[in-house]
């Protein structure tokens, strides 16, 4: 896509204020974000695509149900347990997604891949009691996972080498990885935020569930924590997702769910290029990733 108009080169993509977006995001939703109202009891998950957003949201859903923060009465009757998103199209063609979200019952669990600069003010600079969980994953595994996902979805027709270069240069969906993670990382000391890393969750799932529960002020028994850990293992969620007939791409969300899968795809040259970009962008920021 280098040197060419993104919409001419990849017709399912479009550029908005210098960032590449998939067509399903829709410009109307992005235009509406500065005025979108965030409620005090909203729980928001922010993360670059393929960072573990859905996995994190499943944990949150289960924690909130176990703590009695969501009940049958507060579940969305149109899609109980569904993960709502700012930046994705919905089946109802009569409403853009921000209008759809405005009518959803509280508490809402909303996921977004948006950079901080594109997010609603109530997420980018939160006040009140809104809870925001930022999920991050190392850029190499993120790129490999995104390649396989977008290829299965039919959005990507490039080979791995071309895709890896586009990802590294921020010429793929949602733009530059580092611009995204560092924008949210600036808020690491804000009490409205909890930051989680995919690799840490893989190493200590129980600890991740307990962190989420504490952050959401959800008092859980040990047995409830153990049940959530078992329910939200990659193995169990993959079975659910693979059989899903849900809207969109849920059935291809889960693939391997491991850390270090980048080694199966990266050439030495690609590895060196990704390492150089990593050091250039993260040196001195305090943000580090594990690659194993």
Model feature map: region roles:
Residues 140-143, 206-213, 222-225, 271, ...:
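An amphipathic alpha-helix signature
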Residues 1-196, 242-260, 264-292:
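PAPS-dependent sulfotransferase catalytic domain
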Residues 214-255:
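Catalytic lobes of large eukaryotic enzymes
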Residues 52-66, 196-220, 228, 236:
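PAPS/PAP-binding and catalytic site of the sulfotransferase fold
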């Amino acid at each position: 896509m280098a040197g060419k108009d993104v919409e001419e080169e990849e017709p399912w993509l479009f550029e908005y204020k210098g960032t590449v977006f998939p067509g399903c995001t829709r410009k109307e939703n992005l235009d509406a974000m500065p005025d979108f109202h965030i409620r005090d009891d909203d729980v928001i998950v922010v993360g670059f695509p393929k960072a573990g957003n859905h996995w994190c949201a499943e944990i949150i859903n289960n924690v909130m149900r176990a703590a009695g923060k969501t009940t049958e009465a507060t579940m969305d009757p149109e899609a109980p347990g569904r993960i709502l998103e700012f930046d994705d199209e919905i089946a109802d063609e009569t409403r853009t997604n921000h209008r759809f979200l405005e009518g959803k019952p509280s508490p809402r669990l909303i996921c977004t891949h948006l950079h901080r600069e594109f997010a609603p003010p109530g997420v980018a600079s939160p006040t009140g009691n809104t809870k925001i969980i930022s999920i991050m994953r190392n850029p190499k595994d993120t790129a490999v996972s995104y390649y396989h996902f977008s290829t299965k979805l039919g959005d990507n027709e490039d080979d791995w080498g071309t895709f890896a270069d586009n990802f590294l240069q921020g010429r793929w969906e949602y733009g530059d990885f580092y611009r995204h993670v560092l924008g949210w990382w600036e808020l690491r000391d804000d009490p409205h935020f909890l930051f989680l890393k995919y690799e840490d969750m893989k190493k200590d799932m129980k600890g991740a569930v307990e962190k989420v529960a504490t952050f959401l002020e959800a008092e859980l028994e040990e047995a409830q924590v153990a049940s959530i850990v078992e329910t939200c293992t990659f193995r169990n969620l993959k079975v659910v997702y693979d059989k899903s007939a849900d809207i969109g791409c849920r059935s291809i969300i889960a693939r391997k769910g491991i850390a270090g899968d980048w080694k199966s795809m990266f050439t030495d040259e690609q590895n060196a290029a990704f390492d150089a970009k990593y050091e250039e962008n993260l040196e001195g920021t305090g943000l580090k990733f594990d690659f194993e």
